[in-house]
Structures are given as C-alpha cells and as structure tokens.
Regions:
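C-terminal motif of bacterial Sec signal peptides marking the signal peptidase cleavage site
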Residues: 12-15
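Bacterial signal peptide processing site
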Residues: 17-20
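Extracytoplasmic "Venus flytrap"
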Residues: 27-48, 52-55, 61-72, 92-94, ...
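An alpha-beta-alpha
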Residues: 49, 135-175, 179, 271-289
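Periplasmic-binding protein-like
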Residues: 84-91, 111, 201-212, 231
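Flexible loop/hinge segments that line or gate small-molecule binding clefts
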Residues: 103-127, 232-244
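Hydrophobic alpha-helical segments within soluble ligand-binding/sensing domains
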Residues: 125-147, 248-264
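Hinge/cleft segment of the Venus flytrap/periplasmic-binding protein
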Residues: 264-319
Length: 319
C-alpha cells in the first residue's frame, strides 16, 4: 500500500488552521484504484489534487492501488490521522464503501464518481457524457470512408455511447455504428480483441470509450491507418493524423471546483452532474486532416450548446 504526502515531496505548506469547521477544508486526500502515472484518468486525479494544494494552501495526500474495501477503510483512517477532511475516491468503486463508512467519519466529506451517494457527508460526481459523445460522433462521421464507425466502451450505461451514435447519424445518415463492450475500464486485452472484430467489419473510425485501454487502441489504429476519437484526455499527442479529436473530461478542474464548493460551505450531498457549461468537459484539438470549415462549424455548435443547452439537432441531451 502506497501512502504519499505531497506537501513533503513537493512543497511544505503552512498556514493550515487548527481544528475542523463545517465548510473549511483542512487537508485533502485522493484514492486511486490503479496508479497516478497512467497518463489518463489516474493522472487527471493527481493533477486535480496538486491544483487543490496550490489553490487552497493545504496539505494533500494520495494512495494508489485502492481496490478493495479493507484497503479503502484503512486509507480513510490514515487520512483522518493527517487531518484530511475532504477525500476523493477516483472512481465508481468507491461510492458504496464511502456510504458504509460515512457515519464513522462525520467530520470528513467523501466524494466519488459515477455512483449513488446516500449519506449527508457523501457526494458522487458524474460527467454528463452525452453531448461530448454527440460531437465526437459528428466528427467521426464526417471523416469515415466506409460509413462504418465503432465504439469500444466499458459499460452500456455510459451516456457518451448513445451520444456518439446520435451525433454520427445526425452528421451522416448513411453511417452505421457498431458497439462493443469490455465490462471493465482497464481490460486492454479484451479491448484489442474487440478492435480486431471491428476492423474485420471495415470500421475506419473508432471511439475507445475507456480510459484504461484507449491508448492501446489508438496505437493499433495508427498502425492500421484508421482514425480514432480520443477519450478523457486530449490524445492528439498520440498521432495528430490518427486522433480526429478527443472528448475531454477535466477531472482535475472538477476537483478544484468541488474543493471550492466545500470550502465555501456549498458542496451538496447526493449525486451531482457536470457538463460543458461547468468548464469541465471540452473537445480536444482537431486533427489537421479535418477541413477548416468543419472545425469552424463544430466550434460554433459547441458554443451554441454551452449558451443554449441545445445540440445541433435542436434537442437537449436526454436526462
């Protein structure tokens, strides 16, 4: 079990007040199921923690490899000894255990992702992924030569999946979208098997909607001369001629936003959703293979969505 005190590694920060008042953050902690060095989801959480350290002048801690309830319980106990009162569990796997232990740590607020927060000191965060998927689908459909697009998602509940399908069909009525699932965010081997099946069916643009395998998928698409839509991070650096654009979830910015709400005494319990309008979702850099006219059109569509809440088809994302 790894337990890191970032203020010792990076910068010794003073000025932390003694005691714990409602709405006042003493120190912050982060739990990640894998590592902060994955370059995608875990790294985003780590960057958010560093942002909190800088913005709010607090000590921050993180633990990696937090995959089971026993390790999570121990980590929260350890955090409490360090006067941590705002804890981020960087994934849906933390929602249930946070609900269970919340009553034992009433002076802490426990924040997770994509779950159901039921206690007064728990909150679950969700990125509203439909719109980003819609814009990703539009972009993919504008560049396909075979009219066959593919999605390799982790789970069927991901709203970006249906968003991608609807966006692709809005842009190109001839487009067919084939969807497959891995059943886990990190099953790279399974995802690559799914990719082989899609490529055998003449799919020429793929949306790997899973942060644990998207890099592997994009690398293989690059080798085969196909296109990708990046996921979670702006993945244009993996190949600007391969990655048409990316659907970017700024977990780092969201963590700073949540820390600000907590400090102001405005962080609500329960389940909260966030979208483009909150500044925590965006589209990544567009590939140079995409015509300037289409880029301009997409930027106008995105701005209109931020301003009005309506997508290019005139509809709002489904609830």
């Amino acid at each position: 079990m790894k337990f890191f005190h970032l203020s010792m590694i990076l910068l010794l920060i003073g000025g932390c007040s003694a005691g714990n008042r409602s709405g006042e953050m003493d120190n912050a902690g982060l739990l990640v199921p894998e590592t902060i060095d994955d370059g995608v989801w875990g790294t985003k959480g780590y960057q958010g923690l560093l942002g909190i350290q800088k913005e709010f002048d607090v000590k921050v801690y993180y633990k990696e490899g937090m995959k089971n309830d026993a390790s999570v319980r121990q980590a929260i106990d350890d955090f409490e000894k360090e006067d941590v009162n705002l804890v981020f569990g960087h994934g849906s796997e933390y929602s249930s255990i946070f609900n269970e232990v919340a009553s034992e740590h009433k002076d802490m607020h426990l924040v997770s992702f994509n779950g159901d927060a039921t206690q007064k000191n728990t909150t679950s965060l969700t990125f509203k992924g439909y719109a980003m998927g819609f814009f990703g689908g539009m972009t993919a459909a504008s560049q396909t030569k075979t009219d066959r697009l593919g999605i390799i998602a982790a789970f069927s509940w991901q709203p970006e999946v249906q968003g991608f399908i609807d966006g692709a069909r809005y842009q190109n009525s001839e487009a067919e979208v084939l969807v497959d699932y891995t059943g886990h965010w990190d099953h790279a081997e399974v995802a690559l098997e799914r990719l082989d099946g899609l490529l055998d069916q003449d799919v020429d643009v793929v949306y790997p909607a899973g942060d644990g395998y998207n890099v592997a998928i994009i690398e293989k698409l690059k080798e085969s001369g196909r296109y990708a839509i990046g996921y979670v991070s702006d993945q244009s650096d993996l190949g600007e001629s391969t990655v048409l654009t990316s659907t970017v979830q700024h977990a780092d910015k969201l963590y700073e936003l949540i820390a600000g709400k907590y400090t102001a005494g405005e962080l609500e319990s329960g389940n909260l959703e966030f979208d483009f309008q909150d500044g925590v979702i965006s589209m990544g850099e567009f590939s140079p293979v995409i015509p300037d006219g289409f880029k301009s059109e997409m930027n106008q569509h995105i701005k209109a969505y931020v301003d009005t809440g309506k997508l290019p088809n005139g509809k709002e994302p489904p609830l």
